[in-house]
Amino acid sequence: MADRRVGNRPMGRRGRLEIQSGTCNVCSAPCSSCMHHNAEFSGSKSDESSDENSHGVLASQCSFNGDNLLRSSGVNAPGSSHNTSSEASHLVNSNHDTSSENAESKEIIRSSDISHGPLLDRPHKDQDSMKVDSCNDHQARSTLGQGKVKEKSGAKNNEEKKNTLTGSSKHSGPRVGKSGENVLLNKADESNTSAMSDSESENDPEMLELDVKVCDTCGDAGREDLLAICSRCSDGAEHTYCMRVMLKKVPKGYWLCEECKFAEKAEKHKLETKRKRESEVNVNTQISSKRHIDKFEAVPDSKRLAVGAQIGSPKRSVLPRMSTLSRETSFKGLEKPTRKLAHYSSFNSHSSDDTESTRSTDSQLQSPKGSFLKSNSFNSLSSRSKVRPVDDDMLPRQKTGNENSSLEVKEGFSKNVGKSMSSRCIDVGSSNCNDSKVKGSKQLKDWSTEANPSASISRGNSSIPYAKSPRDLKDLQSDGKQGSLSKQARHLSRNRLEDIVASVGDSSKNEKCSSSEQISSEAKCKDELAQVDGVPRSREFREAGEKTKDAVGNHQKRNIGEDNNKGNRLRAAVDAALRKKPSFSKNRGLEQSDLPPVSNVDSGCNKALKCLSSKVPVIRDWPVGFQGLPGGHPNLRTDKQTNTVNEKQFTLAGTDATTASQSVEPEVNDPSVQSVMRDLPVAAPNVLSTTSAIPKPEYIWQGDLEVQKSRNLSAMHSGIQAYLSTLASPKVVEVVKQFPEKVTLNEVPRLSSWPAQFQDTGAKEQHVALFFFAKDIESYEKNYKPLVDNMIQKDLALKGNLEGVELLIFASNQLPQDCQRWNMLFFLWGVFRGKKESCSNPPKNTPLPASCVSPNRDTFRHENPSNKKSLTDRTLSRMQSCMKEEDAKEGKACSGTEKENAFSVSYGEGEVDVETEEGEIGVSPQLKYEKTAGPGTVKSADMNQRVNVDDLNKEGLCEGPANKKLKTVTGVETGCSIVRRDTSVHKFASRKFV
């Protein structure tokens, strides 16, 4: 044992130094280039840590032959150590003459295997077939001749190693464990292999390149302790200081290089895209299945088998459905324009489900018979016409619109469907498309009638959004023939309207329509005027299908631009027309019975128009309702267009007068138009009386109203604005400008403050001096509306004394029925009433006899109108006698005679306003043209009976006490006494004579 230990170390050193001189026993190649050798040396070096005793034992190992233990021929020879090291990794399956065969070979096996028969084969006969993992257990393989032995070394063999060494030193073959002998030989091979691996790794440059990792960024090994290695790929590595986001230390666990990160992101993106596509496919599959079910119910029985096959396989319902439409790809290229075309071609016959109907059309287009017919009438599957059918002669024209629309889709102009091609019969409530399923065959049959002039004209006439009269509308619905249309054309030609006035009239009729309806109305009005001469217009409509959508868009923009300048053109046209023809010819008065009646167009443009035969109603611009604007201005837009002033109608002398009056109405509050109207001669006074009283745009006063109620209660109503009437007197402006910010009014019964003038004729819009509105919505809801409602319910009025005049405010329910609302709401209006002023030197202590009291206003209510003139004469004679008596007693009349308030104005020669204790103030000068045909009318010849107070005083005609003052027809007050003999005294003082 001592010799073996001593000889162990020199053998190990020599083996490591002279390892290159050996050759492989398998392939006879140098050990440095042999693959068998390299594979054996690739094991771990962990076994080098085994103690030196094992190396010494391996150096002096013996081979066994049978049950006898024989020494190897070379026992621990120092010179042969380099030969043994080259064969250390091979296992030799030797027979009985193993020693002699190894002696003849060039290399001597110092560490030989144990060739055993009964020792190894008895307990473990399957020892040769043991398989060991080369990576985990670092086992070596060798083959020599026919035998192969695979050994496994483990941690348990380390304990058996010492026993094996002890048994082999004593040459006790039977005592050596069968597995221990194999482990002993394996350990000997591993020790020599580790020695060979060290020397081989130092001399082989290829092994160095495989083991060293290089940074992908800098390309250098750098600091290996800061080199992070990719967890996915084998060659990805990067220093922590070379990373895009520098790390302080090498990341532990899962880390990916840049390339792997990019690849991972790409994979995730692909997966997400794939999921989205799958979800879309699922949704489309469900929708497609649902559509197939609906489609299955709509199609005939002959097609249900084919459709049922698609319903049974929903996965195939997406792509195969497109293949079935391949024949009509050019026609069904775009889905949305096709739906829009279907909407227009059905003439606004709305279906319950346009989308499903369009889907059902796809299958119907494939049928060889009547496919185009079904595409035009597919909406009839789900709906029926809800209005009266159109005439038979209009069907060819409607059919042409459908056919042109379909041709446009084939040519790629699916969006170029003009509004003129769709029926606008809904606007006039005249007609709509009949059941397409019933008349579809007739449309297809009458294809050749496209160029028929009567069909073209009848269609154009039916498309007009305004009708001349219910009679004309009835003719269109019943006849639809060229004869009735020619009659209408003759009516139009008989108008002889000037171009500018006609265009203004048309624009004024349509100014309250929506923009789309205006464009359609102008286009169709032009069609009607073009068809007056009877020239067929079918070619123009045929060419409509060939226009591009750009041309249609430009045309619509041009029409919109023209409509924007409508107001300026209207004013200019009215001014020019009225100045050009200031007088109305009378020789054409009987001619207007042949004219089409003037249409009454309301704000909705959707009602039938009334025919008033030969009498034209006075169109007025009375506003109805309240709508506050940002600056406190009311909205002057009107919702009513026609009304008769003084409940009368008059006949204008000619067509030009009719057109002019219609054109003036929307701009009646415009100063330029008003000036033109005032410049008109007196030949047509009734035209001036048609002017309406409306608020001016700017408010004249804004403040609060303090209403004094009974029992010393008061209520404050803030945010009230006063607007001056367009017919108010200029004196009203002077008074209103002196109003304080808070006006105090008394709440009184309306009958007690109702002017006597209103008791006979009633209050009219011309009597309104001021309009009262709320400045905003909040003020209206909190203050204005409760005040108006209270006054209407309790029949109250507001009364106040301001600047020497009396202000009376009433609710609008006291006005005529057509003037009671502003934007559909009640409002407040006010008038002024002049007050009497006493003489400068009145007697103070003279009692007032009961007979000298003025007759009560209530007694005037039931007087006999036939006695008015005689009562006037008696009253004048009484005043003369009163003045004479007073002059006889006092010698002079009251020098302090004063006129009544300046608001009572006399207009023209021979015209005087007569008022007593009360009189309306603020009436427009235009009321001078308003003539009353009753017995109370006093003509200018009778008004020459003016009474001069000075002359009466000089003649001494005034008698009686001076404490009673009466007003003469000149508005002069004087002190006199009247013996009251008759209670039914004429109340001429409260009427206005013209």
UniProtKB/Swiss-Prot annotation:
Pfam families: SPOC_AIPP2. Disruption phenotype: No obvious developmental defects. Enhanced accumulation of intronic heterochromatin (HC)-containing genes functional full-length transcripts (e.g. IBM1, At3g05410 and RPP7). Increased expression of At4g16870, a transposable element (TE) of Copia-like retrotransposon origin, associated with methylated status. The double mutant aipp2-1 paipp2-1 exhibits multiple developmental defects, such as a dwarfed size, early flowering, small leaves and poor fertility. Transmembrane segments: none annotated. InterPro entries: AIPP2-like_SPOC (IPR056280), PHD1-3/5-6 (IPR049914), Znf_FYVE_PHD (IPR011011), Znf_PHD (IPR001965), Znf_RING/FYVE/PHD (IPR013083). Zn(2+) 1 binds at residues 215, 218, 239, 242. Residues 39-182, 187-206, 342-567, 839-875 are annotated as: Disordered. Residues 60-102, 417-435, 449-464 have a biased composition (Polar residues). Gene3D superfamilies: Zinc/RING finger domain, C3HC4 (zinc finger). Residues 371-384 have a biased composition (Low complexity). GO terms for molecular function: histone binding; histone H3K27me3 reader activity; zinc ion binding. Expressed ubiquitously. A zinc finger (PHD-type) spans 212-263. Keywords: Metal-binding, Transcription, Transcription regulation, Zinc, Zinc-finger. Residues 45-54, 119-140, 148-163, 469-478, 536-552, 858-875 have a biased composition (Basic and acidic residues). Zn(2+) 2 binds at residues 230, 233, 257, 260. Together with AIPP3/BDT1 and PAIPP2, cooperates to form a BAH-PHD bivalent histone reader complex able to read histone H3 lysine 27 trimethylation (H3K27me3) and low-methylated H3K4 histone marks in order to regulate transcription, especially to prevent early flowering; promotes AIPP3/BDT1 binding to H3K27me3. CPL2 is subsequently recruited to form a BAH-PHD-CPL2 complex (BPC) in order to silence several H3K27me3 and low-methylated H3K4 enriched loci, including AGO5, via the phosphorylation state-dependent inhibition of Pol II release from the transcriptional start site (e.g. PANTHER family: PTHR33304, RING_FYVE_PHD ZINC FINGER SUPERFAMILY PROTEIN. Component of the ASI1-AIPP1-EDM2 (AAE) RNA regulatory complex composed of at least AIPP1/EDM3, ASI1 and EDM2 and may contain CPL2, AIPP2 and AIPP3/BDT1. Part of the BAH-PHD bivalent histone reader complex that contains AIPP2, PAIPP2 and AIPP3/BDT1; the BAH-PHD module associates with CPL2 to form the BAH-PHD-CPL2 complex (BPC) for transcriptional repression. Binds directly to ASI1, AIPP3/BDT1 and CPL2 but not to PAIPP2. The PHD domain (212-263) recognizes specifically unmodified histone H3 lysine 4 (H3K4me0), binding affinity being inversely proportional to H3K4 methylation level. This is ASI1-immunoprecipitated protein 2. It comes from Arabidopsis thaliana (Mouse-ear cress). The lineage of its organism: Eukaryota, Viridiplantae, Streptophyta, Embryophyta, Tracheophyta. The gene is AIPP2.
